[in-house]
Amino acid sequence: MGELRFAFFLGCIMPNRYPGLEASVRRVFEKLGIELVDMKGASCCPAPGVVRSFKFDTWVALGARNLSIAEEMGLDIVTGCSGCYGTLRDIWYEHREKKEIRDKVDYYLSQIGKSFKGKIKVKHVLEVLHFDVGVEKLKEFIKKPLSNIKAAVHYGCHILKPSDKRPWKEGTEKPRFFDELVEVTGAKSINWKDKFMCCGAGGGVRSGALDVALHMTKEKIENAYASGADCIVNACSFCHLQFDTGQIEINKSYGTSFNMPIIYYTQLLGLAMGLSPEELGLHQNNVSVEPLLRKLGVN
């Protein structure tokens, strides 16, 4: 596997709304021997659905500034938010492919004494685990297989699309890489309706049309229940917020009584590696994960 070091891009939601997710990434990566180095001075990515849509140059300038920080560190970026991944990966890709974007980046960064030459890469947490570590290597770290758990795997949007800017060699229409990572833990990845549908939050929908966002999330949770899932597993802090906080909002709006445990991937992997729920920040979820932990026999 070799020595792995990354500039850790947190984004906004993970450290401010769900620090337990951040803790799970840090602790799992530490167990795997992967060093995460904090990016001092990093800002919002900024959000691909909102900022890119309304002020493209601002999106490019802020994103390029974040990329320049990692390049100054001499490290590839890793992030656990798919929205952040979408922004940083897209700007990195377009900087490489389009002179117009390179010119914008050069102009805006020159105003603050910075530059970006495209010498680093942008990776998602799942990308590092699947490609840099590898499924077979991960199996060596499993101490407590989660063999009685049925997981509804939620890929989300930005980790897959646009497909020409993503690294998934199997394609992005019906990928298996996330399912394979989930099944490393011993859990079963089940088939469920609308598996690849948006969580409801992205593209500014949660901010601009909460009722629409909650309707989409409600449908996904209903489908997860119908499939017999014990939990929904995600790999994006914004998707996590939408499923977790969104369930509370849905219950208030629709009079439902959803209590589907929402698990971020490194929380699931960490449990299988023998880390405690407290170490993985599972107690910080709004929707209790106790039913899942009881089924696993974890105190």
Question: What is the meaning of each model-derived region?
Answer:
Residues 1-299:
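Iron-sulfur cluster-binding electron-transfer modules in prokaryotic oxidoreductases
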